[in-house]
Amino acid sequence: TEDGAFGWGQMSTYHADITAQVLHRQVAPWVTGRFIDAGDPVADFLDIAALVHEREHKFPGSYVRRALAGLDTALWDLLGRQAGKPVTSLIGGAPGRLRAYASSMKRDITPADEANRLCRLRDEKGFDAFKFRVGAECGRGMDEWPGRTEEIVETVPRALGDGVVKMVDANSCFGVERAIEVGRMLEANGITHYEEP
């Protein structure tokens, strides 16, 4: 702002250099100098987002949206700083503890090794919620290797035991029929979260 106030924003780290260029080239020209009313920041941001989408209609897609996400989080941070309040209180919540889960990004690991890894995180770091990978990333229905999904869906939950939350991420591997089939396996093994089937 003109008085030196600022807010920090966050965007996806994937190809952040491209998103930063889009922010400066395709978002900033339409938002610089715009006023955000602290009384109704959501409406003002939606107007700004609509303006960017109208002016940059030839460039729809994830990079413009990622840049807008960075702007959105920066504006909320700015409003929180100006009000002297945490952002959570501005959006109707209350600051408090945030539960974390241990997330594995690995698919090149055997189900037994993954189970051992996650059990160590439980025992050494105190995690009580875990997410691991099934399928192959954007795998067109193929597994990382034949039978891995079936094996890991049984092995990891059995090793972790009861009293912990178990989640999986398929990263858009499965088509509808296989996604449903895997979903039933997950349900049978106490896995309660199924991300990007």
What are these regions (language model features)?
Residues 2-82:
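Metal- or metallocofactor-binding catalytic centers and their adjacent structured scaffolds
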Residues 17, 79, 91, 138-140, ...:
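Active-site-proximal flexible loops/turns
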Residues 36, 88, 96, 165-166:
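Secondary-structure boundary/capping residues
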Residues 46-49, 91, 115, 180:
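Generic structural signal for individual residues within well-ordered alpha-helical segments
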Residues 66, 72-108:
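Glycine-rich, aromatic-flanked loop segments that form ligand/cofactor-binding clefts
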Residues 97-197:
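Metal-dependent enolase-superfamily TIM-barrel catalytic cores that perform enediolate-based chemistry
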